[in-house]
UniProtKB/Swiss-Prot annotation:
Name of the gene: mutL
Keywords: DNA damage, DNA repair
Keyword DNA repair: yes
GO biological processes: mismatch repair
Protein name: DNA mismatch repair protein MutL
Function: This protein is involved in the repair of mismatches in DNA. It is required for dam-dependent methyl-directed DNA mismatch repair. May act as a 'molecular matchmaker', a protein that promotes the formation of a stable complex between two or more DNA-binding proteins in an ATP-dependent manner without itself being part of a final effector complex.
Length: 588
């Protein structure tokens, strides 16, 4: 007797439904996407729940609707109006196309489907009632144009799937996330989400990205974003990303990416976004990103996953590069201080001050009112550190340089911008950004290093000695020239041109440690070397500065390409607006 049997239609339907309908959010996704494809302008989603779980789901739209016959045909497996031949799969522009959703949902729930075709002269709409895949009724009723789908008793005939549904709050969170993602990709449509009859979420179909982001995440969050846009041949990118220095998260939960209007998940594109941030992104942190990517539909294969959340791109590397470039360009054009002209400050005045002139001590807001003579020697060393980065040509900047007010704890610079907002600057992080940018600009050039008058011998560990020969080219690109001088002893003959003190043994050991961490990737090794060198050569915290020195430091910071973060991604600057201060003091 044959053990191989052809499955009956009911079993086949349940298997298919298991692939398409995982939870309540899956039902919402399929029905809302159908409404989007139906040219709806308003989509209302209703969720009802009690202690047992989600009990009802409804989706109502004002789309094109269906006639009496199509309403019934839509529940047949693989019945669709969106494709008709294999060639159509090569250029899909709709969110749905397989003709599986309604049949799969109807197989594991009780469905009431009401629809009226747009522009129909008939006053009647079609209503189809199906329970567990079995047709209960097909009748004419009165209803407005568009479509309304009511799902009752989800998974009532599949107890195994119902058993594995999570708590109501968890399932609701998945529904909210799904609706929010679709709304972010379809900003010209108004979405309304109700839970147990109460409105929980609404967008207004204005077409504006900031409007939808504000509706989903709040107006405060939307103000922390900066726009991204770019055209790279057939690839077009538009959206918003977290401004450097704003709140980041340790998880990747705020990547909202769409390709040709379809929300997708892509680790490759998430990686490209983070690469676009580069040193502006703190280690281990993730930005928020809302990006629309438009491609030729023929370059996108959406028929690779049951839920269509994953897609395959024929030109994936090119798209990744475009995303990375768009993010990078946006971040380096962003300005958060001011676009007003800088105050007149002759460059000659900055670069020709005698080293021994250190200026008057500044008020210290931490409580000390005077600086003792014993602190003047460190001030002279500080002056030398500041001049290392002033010796290079500074690019012109249209940014207003904040006016220095004082210093807190010999570590933070207080200033105010043109709008009167309070600016707090970490002096070490700021100077580190300046130094890193200058080291990076000189790297791999003949101007990267300067020979020491007296070469500096340094004794290395066995590990350092073994690794150093493979690192010499990278170190040379950074400005370091080291030559062997006996067993485990090397002679430092050249250091980065911005600072001769970068040849001291402690700094060399720190740089070698950083380089060893990045062995195998030349660019990463060089970047680590430059970051370490920058950190070691600049003004530290707990260092008193004069008003003049702080003003010069801010001017140098404003002239960098990325003034808002240090090379490691930590913020250099915090802006306390007047409105934010008012809120902190509970002023209305």
């Amino acid at each position: 007797m044959s053990r191989v049997k052809i499955l009956d239609e009911e079993t086949i339907s349940h298997i298919a439904a298991g692939e398409v309908v995982e939870r309540a959010a899956s039902v919402v996704k399929e029905l809302v996407e159908n409404a989007v494809d139906a040219d709806a302008q308003i989509i209302r989603i209703g969720i009802s729940a009690d202690k047992t779980g989600i009990t009802k789901i409804s989706v109502t739209d004002d789309g094109i609707g269906m006639d009496f016959d199509d309403a019934l045909l839509a529940f047949r497996q693989h019945a669709t109006s969106k494709i008709s031949r294999p060639e159509d799969l090569d250029g899909i522009t709709t969110l749905g196309f397989r003709g599986e959703a309604l049949a799969s949902i109807a197989a594991i729930s009780k469905v009431t489907f009401t629809t009226k075709e747009r522009g129909s002269p008939s006053p009647e709409a079609a209503r189809v009632v199906i329970h567990g895949g079995e047709l209960i009724s097909h009748s004419a009723v009165g209803a407005p144009e568009g479509t309304s789908v009511l799902i009752d008793a989800l998974f009532y005939n599949t107890p195994a799937r119902r058993k594995f549904q999570k708590s109501v709050p968890t399932e609701l969170s998945h529904v909210y996330d799904m609706v929010e993602r679709i709304a972010l990709s379809n900003r010209n449509i108004s979405f309304v989400l109700l839970y147990n009859g109460k409105e929980r979420f609404q967008t207004f179909g204005t077409g504006s990205y900031p409007d939808v982001i504000a509706a989903v995440f709040g107006s405060t969050f939307s103000k922390e974003l900066t726009p991204v846009s770019g055209s790279f041949g057939p690839v077009k990118i538009d959206g918003w990303i977290t401004r450097p220095g704003s709140e980041m998260k340790t998880t990747q939960t705020r990547f909202y990416l769409s390709i040709n209007g379809r929300q997708v998940t892509s680790r490759q594109l998430q990686w490209a976004i983070r690469e676009g941030y580069g040193t502006l992104l703190p280690k281990g942190m993730y930005p928020a990103a809302f990006l629309d990517i438009v491609l030729d539909p023929r370059d996108v294969d959406v028929n690779v996953h049951p839920t269509k959340r994953e897609v395959r791109l024929s030109r994936e590397r090119e798209v990744m590069r475009c995303v990375q470039d768009a993010v990078y360009t946006s971040l380096h054009e962003e300005r958060v201080f001011s676009t007003a002209p800088m105050p007149t400050l002759a460059r000659e005045t900055i670069t020709t001050l005698p080293v021994e002139i250190v200026g008057e001590p500044v008020p210290v807001y931490a409580g000390k009112q005077e600086m003792h003579e014993a602190r003047q020697a460190p001030l002279k060393q500080t002056e030398k550190q500041l001049r290392r980065t002033e010796s290079a040509d500074l690019p012109e900047t249209d940014l207003f340089v904040p006016e220095v007010l004082g210093q807190i704890g010999d570590t933070y610079i207080l200033a105010k911008n043109e709008s009167g907002d309070l600016i707090v600057v970490d002096q070490h992080a700021a100077h580190e950004r300046i130094m890193y940018d200058q080291l990076l600009a000189r790297s791999s050039s003949a101007e990267a290093g300067q020979e020491l008058i007296v070469p500096q011998p340094i004794t290395l560990s066995k590990k350092e000695t073994a690794a150093l020969p493979d690192l010499l080219d990278v170190l040379a690109a950074a400005g370091y020239l080291l030559e062997p001088f006996g067993k485990d002893v090397w002679m430092v003959r050249s250091v980065p041109v911005v600072s001769s003190t970068l040849g001291d043994p402690d700094t060399i050991h720190a740089i070698l440690d950083a380089a060893l961490d990045g062995v195998g990737n030349t660019d990463e090794v060089l970047d680590r070397v430059l970051k370490t060198a920058a950190c070691r050569a600049v003004v530290k915290g707990n260092t008193p500065l004069t008003i003049e020195q702080m003003q010069r430091l801010l001017r140098q910071l404003m002239a960098t390409k990325s003034p808002y973060t240090c090379p490691h991604g930590r913020p250099t600057t915090i802006v306390l607006s007047k409105s934010r201060l008012a809120g902190m003091f509970l002023r209305t």
